[in-house]
């Protein structure tokens, strides 16, 4: 029988905690030391009088803002060497990006930001642009805005876009101007990539496939 790792043991306890009380908690001494070493914010929480003198759950910290799978991915990263994101952690990059900012885990934030930028597409670019605003992340903001300015954008529902306009009117104007002035694009019949024609307007700028000239 394979030996259970600390991470496996922890994930199992998280799962049982979720099933029993509907929230995710953990309080072993090893976990506390590990969490405190990775995050200055968590360290302050763990050293607070409220944490130390909790009447009901002595030595337990509760993270309610993450769902079960997100928290398990969060823990997986904390137990790793921090050099890269696993496939499981990548699945929750957006939630962990927020958590990394809240708990000031800079390496996790950097890796999640890179993953989000690499995943930019026509359906999520506006959401990622909004994500970059609070707190402001210039790298993610510039990447999302650059994508929007040079690629087709699929707008969300009217209500979602209206909320975006209300919250970020200047950004909304910039997004709309980009949509109005963007060079028309099409899907290449050879490579399938939604891309722009080259300067002559007769071939795909990705694979070079020649299109008939427009009349």
Swiss-Prot record:
Keyword list, A-Z: Ubl conjugation pathway
InterPro entries: At1g01640-like, BTB/POZ_dom, SKP1/BTB/POZ_sf
S-S pairs: none
Domain (BTB): residue spans on this chain: 17-87
Coiled coil: none
CDD domains listed in its UniProt record: BTB_POZ_ZBTB_KLHL-like (cd18186)
GO terms for biological process, alphabetical: protein ubiquitination
Function according to Swiss-Prot or TrEMBL: May act as a substrate-specific adapter of an E3 ubiquitin-protein ligase complex (CUL3-RBX1-BTB) which mediates the ubiquitination and subsequent proteasomal degradation of target proteins.
Protein name: Putative BTB/POZ domain-containing protein At2g05330
Lineage, top ranks: Eukaryota, Viridiplantae, Streptophyta, Embryophyta, Tracheophyta
């Amino acid at each position: 029988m394979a030996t259970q790792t600390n991470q496996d043991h922890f994930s199992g306890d998280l799962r049982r905690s979720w099933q029993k009380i509907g929230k995710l908690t953990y309080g072993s001494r090893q976990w506390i030391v590990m969490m405190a070493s990775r995050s200055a914010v968590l360290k302050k929480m763990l050293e607070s009088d409220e944490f130390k003198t909790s009447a009901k759950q002595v030595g337990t910290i509760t993270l309610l803002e993450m769902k079960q799978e997100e928290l398990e991915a969060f823990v997986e990263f904390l137990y790793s060497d921090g050099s890269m994101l696993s496939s499981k952690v990548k699945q929750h990059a957006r939630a962990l990006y927020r958590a990394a900012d809240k708990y000031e885990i800079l390496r996790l934030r950097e890796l999640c930001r890179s993953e989000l930028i690499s995943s930019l597409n026509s359906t999520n670019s506006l959401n990622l642009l909004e994500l970059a605003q609070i707190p402001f992340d210039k790298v993610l903001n510039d990447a999302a805005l650059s994508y929007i300015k040079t690629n087709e954008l699929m707008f969300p529902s009217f209500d979602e876009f209206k909320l975006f306009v209300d919250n970020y009117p200047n950004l909304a104007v910039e997004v709309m101007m980009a949509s109005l002035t963007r060079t028309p694009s099409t899907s290449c019949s050879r490579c399938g990539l939604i891309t722009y024609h080259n300067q002559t307007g007769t071939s795909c700028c990705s694979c070079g496939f020649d299109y008939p000239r427009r009349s």
